[in-house]
Amino acid sequence: MLNISHYKIIAIGKIRKKWIQEGIEMYLKRLPGLEVKEIKDSTQLKEEHTIKEIISKNEFLVTLNENGQSFTSKQLATKLLNSHNQNITFVIGGASGLTSSLNNLASWQLSLSPLTFPHEIARLLLIEQLYRAKTITQGGPYHKE
């Protein structure tokens, strides 16, 4: 079973759309222990510096970008389960994305889709997929084939 308290999301920018915020809040209620840190929009280099200050050396870093590895929901659940409850930090860039040096620092890069999404929607999608992964590993009814 996934231990959500081992996961953290660092996201650039505020959620401005109410419907996205409501969706995020709904899933966060279902994922007690998931930490979400929001970083103010800035230049990519300033954002990178702030992110590097937040992450610790013992964390497994996953950056989100369109060039990352794609998974089905079940594959992602399995990958997370196989991480053996390691501390994992997911990083979602802002409008300009993440620096290449930050992406290179990541243990792996995740693509939610070959499509490009606004960072607000990417955050909602990631949180929903973490909830889905949790229910898949628990054998719950949320994920349907």
Curated annotation (Swiss-Prot):
Its main location: cytoplasm. It comes from the Bacteria. The keyword Flavoprotein does not apply. It is an enzyme of class 2 (transferase). One of its GO terms (molecular function) is rRNA (pseudouridine-N3-)-methyltransferase activity. PANTHER family: METHYLTRANSFERASE, RIBOSOMAL RNA LARGE SUBUNIT METHYLTRANSFERASE H. Specifically methylates the pseudouridine at position 1915 (m3Psi1915) in 23S rRNA. This is Ribosomal RNA large subunit methyltransferase H. It comes from Prochlorococcus marinus (strain NATL1A). The lineage of its organism: Bacteria, Bacillati, Cyanobacteriota, Cyanophyceae, Synechococcales.
